[in-house]
Amino acid sequence: MSAATTRLRLRVSPGNGRAEIVGRHGDAWKVRVTAPPEQGRANDAVVRLLADTFALPLSAVAIVSGHSARDKIIELTGVGPALIERRLASASSVDRGRKDRRT
């Protein structure tokens, strides 16, 4: 049996103060990375952020389209869509802010 492969839409904001998953942005997820959008550094930072979030090797995260755009399609190998949604929701700063206000 082959590993699950799932595509994910992202809206990337490069050159920020910290790398984080912000929350939903329409049908995509908004992420921020500290790297500038120069020479693929922001793309590399996006791949690292997602690999860390899902505990995947870097080779399991690939940018399928949008290499030079803010809107990207990412392919994740080894994780299904339901788990992706749960992990992104729990990792998002918007969700963390809601949890902080409830306590």
Spans of model-derived segments:
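Contiguous, often N-terminal, cationic amphipathic patches that form binding interfaces
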Residues: M1-R48, T53-L58, A62-T103
